[in-house]
């Protein structure tokens, strides 16, 4: 089957479905009355074992817990404590990382829903169901990846391009801000991030936008968490104008945008693609208080077709399509770009740059230490970047058989591309270019699903995939609300025995320390703990625990539907709990070609599972 446009499942939602998407706040129990969250709580989230307040389990996004009550010696005793069903017919992909504060879990669901649950029992405290219009345009399923919390409010984004604040105890709407035209493709699927500007002392709510596949211009926002009012907005296409306090501020990069071709026949003086250039920061940001820097990934350029972003008869290597498919350091006071590192210049394959940016202390082969970001890109390369200035320190492949580039030049920071891997223009008189086989495909060596870093082993645990793809160019013109790709594609198998591969990577040597292969693609995030454990989920519904040092599979549990979310862990009343959202969906079954066929037998679902060692047997057991 040739895929040339967005899946039918992502057309405007039917009136029948929308009829049941009612705004509600069901007070099925007394108000949660959890403690208000302070900035100090958020700043110490990575150290606090009782709460999980940020996406990434801390502003450093390491997904590392110092808890060890559940460990490699007793993890085989894990049993379900409870499970909560999201209910009704609204299933699809459940990609949410839950957060927890003072014994209350807040987890988002598909179709822009939020649930507040008692962390001990799973009892529902309240539910918020957002009313969605018919003409939303999510590219990659009706997912939501999580909420944020500060003070007495819960914050999350919606598929109709809104960011909403709810009272954390009742689920009532406090404020609701529209930031983009959803009919043009603007959405919000990522979890917002709370940061504190070290210069002004103000706490800010940071969120991005989605919609690169529809020709939006990606934008990063800072808001007052109390009122929702915009403080600043920064676009991620070179030459587009930012805002500060409601007024135009500065353009992003050079106002003349030399990384995008000129076209004197247009109103802007630039090629059409510049006006619809993508770069959407749809994943959650990280924050480095030491350098007072927001660090976030920028999405793919629009359209995918590299020739639409290259001058007539020009060379794609002369036009990098800034500031797309890379990582950006942003000043929280003004929204200005402090630094930018591009993983894939003039990205021709939709590799994007949105995968998480993990903050860690990197020690190079000579023993010199740097404050760094770690990033496993969809293009198949793992990057270590100095987060004080955006300079590349190390890069190496984390998946097999990368075809589009031979390596990353550590001196220039640029990929060394292999000839013939950019899909060629159609020949004269033809509407489609000659197909070219590329690996990884646009779904990536790893996609949005976040890796974890262990402070004990010094390893990154990367949920990777091995697959490949045929690409070919097609004619492309912008039309509001329609897919803006200019590329056709089909994803294919690389190996017969597996697609997914959980890999433990050494960031200094680039070596694979261990790997565990899975038959289906890996689309779940990873959690690492001081108990020498690594947790993740599989496409066929298993929640698994591995020995962090050796990769030995120690425990698994069948949840009933595929897992495409990041797990969390916390301590309550002297016991360690592990929780994970369950429900198969996301991009793979919608865009995945042969992979969609492979995953057809997986049942949909929507639930949150919690595990612990039974109270009657909490002593460390000998195996």
UniProtKB/Swiss-Prot annotation:
Q: What induces it?
A: Induced by ethanol, and to a lesser extent, by 1-propanol and other alcohols. Repressed by lactate, acetate and tricarboxylic acid cycle intermediates such as citrate and succinate. Up-regulated by exaE and agmR.
Origin species, per record, is Pseudomonas putida
| CDD domains per UniProt | PQQ_ADH_I
Which family, according to UniProt? Belongs to the bacterial PQQ dehydrogenase family.
Report how activity changes across the pH range.
Optimum pH is 9.0.
Q: Where in the cell is it found?
A: Periplasm
Entry note: cofactor: Binds 1 PQQ group non-covalently per subunit. PQQ is inserted between disulfide Cys-139-Cys-140 and the plane of Trp-282.
Pfam families per the UniProt record, alphabetical: PQQ (PF01011)
Q: What is this protein called?
A: Quinoprotein ethanol dehydrogenase
UniProt cofactor(s): pyrroloquinoline quinone; Ca(2+)
């Amino acid at each position: 089957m040739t895929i040339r446009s967005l899946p039918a499942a992502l057309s405007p939602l039917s009136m029948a479905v929308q009829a049941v998407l009612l705004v509600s706040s069901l007070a099925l129990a007394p108000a949660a009355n959890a403690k208000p969250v302070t900035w100090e709580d958020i700043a110490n989230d990575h150290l606090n074992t009782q709460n999980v307040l940020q996406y990434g389990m801390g502003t450093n996004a390491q997904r590392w817990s110092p808890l060890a009550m559940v460990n490699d010696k007793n993890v085989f005793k894990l049993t379900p404590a409870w499970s909560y069903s999201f209910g009704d017919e609204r299933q699809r992909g459940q990609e949410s990382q839950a957060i927890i504060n003072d014994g209350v879990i807040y987890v988002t669901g598909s179709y822009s829903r939020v649930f507040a649950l008692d962390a001990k029992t799973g009892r529902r405290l309240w539910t918020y169901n957002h009313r969605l219009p018919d003409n939303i345009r999510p590219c990659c399923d009706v997912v939501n990846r999580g909420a944020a919390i500060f003070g007495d409010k819960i914050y999350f984004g919606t598929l109709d391009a809104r960011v909403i604040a709810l009272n954390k105890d009742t689920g009532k709407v406090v404020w609701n801000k529209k930031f983009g035209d959803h009919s043009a493709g603007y959405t919000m699927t990522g979890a917002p991030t709370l940061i504190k500007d070290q210069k002004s002392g103000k706490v800010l709510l940071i969120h991005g936008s989605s919609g690169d596949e529809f020709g939006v211009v990606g934008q990063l926002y800072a808001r007052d968490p109390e009122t929702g009012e915009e403080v600043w907005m920064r676009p991620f296409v070179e030459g587009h104008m930012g805002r500060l306090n409601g007024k135009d501020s500065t353009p992003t990069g050079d106002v003349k945008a030399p990384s995008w071709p000129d076209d004197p026949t247009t109103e802007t003086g630039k090629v059409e693609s510049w006006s619809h250039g993508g770069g959407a920061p749809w994943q959650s940001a990280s924050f480095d208080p030491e350098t007072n820097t927001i660090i976030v990934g920028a999405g793919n350029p629009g359209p995918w077709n590299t020739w639409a972003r290259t001058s007539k008869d020009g060379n794609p290597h002369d036009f990098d399509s800034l500031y797309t498919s890379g990582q950006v350091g942003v000043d929280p006071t003004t929204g200005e770009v402090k630094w930018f590192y591009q993983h894939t210049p003039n990205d021709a394959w939709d590799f994007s740059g949105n995968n998480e940016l993990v903050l860690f202390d990197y020690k190079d082969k000579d023993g010199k230490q740097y404050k760094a970001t770690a990033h496993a890109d969809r293009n198949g390369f793992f990057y270590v970047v100095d987060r004080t200035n955006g300079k590349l320190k190390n890069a190496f492949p984390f998946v097999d058989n990368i075809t589009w580039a031979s390596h990353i030049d550590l001196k220039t920071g640029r990929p060394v591309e292999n000839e013939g891997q950019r899909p060629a223009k159609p020949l004269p008189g033809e509407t489609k270019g000659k197909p070219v086989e590329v690996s990884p495909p646009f779904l990536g060596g790893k996609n949005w699903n976040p890796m974890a870093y262990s402070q004990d082993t010094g390893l990154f645990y990367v949920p990777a995939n091995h697959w490949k793809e045929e690409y070919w160019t097609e004619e492309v013109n912008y039309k509001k609300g329609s897919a803006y790709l200019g590329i056709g594609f089909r994803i294919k198998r690389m190996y017969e025995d597996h697609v997914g591969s959980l890999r433990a990577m050494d960031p200094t040597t680039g070596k694979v320390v261990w790997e565990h292969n899975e038959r289906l693609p890996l689309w779940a995030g990873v959690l690492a703990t001081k108990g020498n454990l690594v947790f993740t989920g599989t496409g066929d519904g298993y929640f698994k625990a591995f020995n962090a040092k050796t990769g030995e599979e120690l425990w698994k549990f069948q949840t009933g539907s595929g897992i495409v979310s990041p797990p969390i862990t916390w301590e309550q009343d002297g016991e360690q709990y592990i929780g994970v959202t369950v429900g198969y969906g996301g991009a793979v079954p919608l865009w995945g070609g042969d992979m969609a066929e492979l995953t057809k037998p997986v049942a949909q679902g929507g639930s949150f599972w919690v595990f612990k060692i039974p109270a009657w047997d909490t002593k460390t057991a000998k195996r």
